[in-house]
């Protein structure tokens, strides 16, 4: 019971960060597939054409 109560806030926070990171990665790959990318990790695909 104690661990559940204690870990709940940190679980929510880490879930938020994890989801944000996953969204960022999926956006990066989506843009890379479309031939444009605003993330340096895309390397030679790094560009932000609209």
UniProtKB/Swiss-Prot annotation:
Residues 1-7 form the signal peptide. It comes from the Eukaryota. One of its GO terms (cellular component) is extracellular region. InterPro entries: Conotoxin_a-typ. Residues 1-26 are annotated as: Disordered. Expressed by the venom duct. Residues 8-35 form a propeptide. The modification Cysteine amide is found at residue 48. GO terms for molecular function: acetylcholine receptor inhibitor activity; toxin activity. Residues 1-13 have a biased composition (Polar residues). Residues 14-26 have a biased composition (Basic and acidic residues). Disulfide bonds join 37-42, 38-48. Keywords: Amidation, Disulfide bond, Secreted, Signal, Toxin. Pfam families: Toxin_8 (PF07365). It is found in: Secreted. The cysteine framework is I (CC-C-C). Alpha3/5 pattern. Found in injectable (milked) (IV) venom. Belongs to the conotoxin A superfamily. This is Alpha-conotoxin CnIG.
């Amino acid at each position: 019971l104690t661990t559940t109560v204690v870990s709940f806030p940190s679980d929510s926070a880490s879930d938020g960060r994890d989801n944000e990171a996953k969204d960022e990665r999926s956006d990066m790959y989506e843009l890379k597939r479309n031939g444009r990318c605003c993330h340096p990790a895309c390397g030679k695909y790094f560009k932000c054409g609209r």
